[in-house]
A protein has these predicted regions:
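Mid/C-terminal beta-alpha module of Rossmann-like enzyme folds, strongest
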Residues: 2, 201-265, 280, 292-310
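N-terminal Rossmann NAD(P)H-binding glycine-rich loop of SDR-like oxidoreductase domains
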Residues: 2-24
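Conserved Rossmann-fold NAD(P)-dependent oxidoreductase catalytic core, especially the SDR/UDP-sugar
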Residues: 27, 85-132, 149
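NAD(P)H-binding glycine-rich loop region in Rossmannoid oxidoreductase-like domains
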Residues: 34-94
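Short-chain dehydrogenase/reductase
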Residues: 77-81, 112, 123-135, 164-168, ...
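Conserved beta-loop-beta element that borders a ligand/cofactor-binding pocket
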Residues: 103, 135-160
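Substrate-positioning beta->alpha
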Residues: 162-169, 183-206, 213-217
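Alpha-helical membrane-targeting segments
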Residues: 169-191, 243-276
C-alpha cells in the first residue's frame, strides 16, 4: 500500500494518476479527504493526533507527506512539528519509507543557485519551521531509525490546479480577460517547477533504491525566465496582450492590512527581490530529465485554464 498524506493538493492529484497507472494500491489521507478516481481507499484523519496518524499509515510500504496547511505562521509553528513527529512514528511502526515533499524556505536568501548542499539559513518564521521539521527527518534517517527522503521543489505552476503563485497571478487573470500581476521584481530570473514533473519525480525517486536517505531537488528547468518573459509567453497562449502590473512591497504591505494571506506572504518577498535560482542537476544526472521546457509547461497550463473557463 502506498499512502499519500495530504489529499486534494496539486501534487497529490497528479501523483494519484501516476500511481494508479502503475496499478499501485493507493490510500489517500486528509482531514476532509474525498474519494478520488484512482485511489483504492480514502481516509479522513487528523495527523496532529498520533493515534490517527498511526492508523492512517498502518500497512503502508511507502508514505508521501504532501500535507498543505493554512498559510499562517502560527498554525505552522503549532501543527508542523506534531505532524512530522507523528508521521515519523507512524512510519516506524508500519515499517514504511517516508518521502517528504518540501519547499526552499529553510535556505533563506541565497546568492547563487540553491542546491541540495545549500545550508539552512532561514530569514523568515516559516523558514525556521521548515528547517526544524526537515532537520527532524534528516536526523531520523541518519540514525538509521527510518528510511526517508526529502524531495524539494521551487515555487510551482501547472495545469489542473488553482494553487501556485503564477497560476493565481498570471493564468487565472488571463483566463478571465483580466490583467496579470507579478511579485516585486519582474526583471530577475525566477525558477518554477512544473507540477507534473514534480509528481513524476516522486514516483521515480521512490522506485530507485539508491535514492533513499538523501535530499533531492525535483526536476526544474534550468535557465529560468524573468517575470516579464513568463507573462509574455502566457499571454501569447491566451491570445492577449501581455498586460500586467508589478506588485511592489509598499502596495503589498498596505494590502496586508486587509488581507491575511498577503500579510502572511510578506516575509517571503525576499524570494522575489533578486534571482531565485533552483538547481536540480543532481536529479538530471541520475534520471536523465531536467524538467519540462517553460514554453511547453506554460502552453499546457494555459490550455487547462482555458478549458475550465469555457
Amino acid at each position: 500500500m502506498i499512502t499519500i498524506l495530504g489529499a486534494g493538493g496539486a501534487i497529490a492529484n497528479e501523483l494519484v494518476k501516476l500511481l494508479a497507472a502503475r496499478n499501485q494500491p493507493i490510500r489517500l489521507v486528509g482531514r476532509n479527504a474525498k474519494s478520488t478516481p484512482g485511489a483504492t481507499e480514502t481516509i479522513a484523519a487528523d495527523l496532529t493526533d498520533k493515534d490517527q496518524a498511526i492508523s492512517a499509515v498502518s500497512g503502508s510500504s511507502v508514505v508521501y507527506l504532501l500535507v498543505g496547511l493554512k498559510y499562517d505562521r502560527k498554525i505552522w509553528a503549532e501543527m508542523w512539528p506534531r505532524i512530522m513527529s507523528n508521521t515519523i512514528e507512524a512510519c516506524k511502526r508500519a515499517g514504511a519509507k517516508l518521502i517528504f515533499f518540501d519547499n526552499v524556505y529553510m535556505y533563506g536568501k541565497v546568492s547563487g543557485p540553491m542546491t541540495e548542499e545549500t545550508p539552512f539559513n532561514p530569514c523568515s518564521k516559516k523558514g525556521e519551521i521548515r528547517a526544524k521539521i526537515a532537520t527532524t527527518l534528516i536526523n531520523e534517517w541518519k540514525s538509521g531509525a527510518l528510511t526517508g527522503m526529502i524531495a524539494r521543489s521551487a515555487d510551482f505552476y501547472g495545469p489542473a490546479t488553482r494553487n501556485g503563485v503564477p497560476n493565481v497571478l498570471v493564468f487565472e487573470p488571463f483566463s478571465q480577460g483580466k490583467k496579470a500581476s507579478w511579485l516585486v521584481n519582474d526583471s530577475v530570473p525566477h525558477s518554477l517547477t512544473y507540477t507534473p514533473d514534480a509528481a513524476q519525480s516522486l514516483v521515480q525517486l521512490a522506485e530507485r533504491a539508491t535514492a533513499w536517505n538523501q535530499t533531492w531537488h525535483v526536476p526544474t528547468t534550468p535557465n529560468p525566465l524573468a517575470g516579464k518573459e513568463f507573462v509574455a509567453l502566457a499571454a501569447r497562449e491566451f491570445g492577449v496582450a501581455p498586460k500586467y502590473r508589478v506588485l511592489r512591497r509598499p502596495i503589498l504591505r498596505i494590502a496586508g492590512w486587509f488581507d491575511p494571506l498577503v500579510a502572511e506572504s510578506y516575509e517571503m518577498l525576499y524570494q522575489s527581490d533578486s534571482p531565485y535560482l533552483f538547481d536540480s542537476n543532481k536529479f538530471a544526472r541520475e534520471f536523465g530529465f531536467a524538467g519540462t521546457p517553460y514554453a511547453e509547461g506554460i502552453r499546457n497550463t494555459a490550455a487547462s485554464f482555458k478549458a475550465k473557463s469555457r
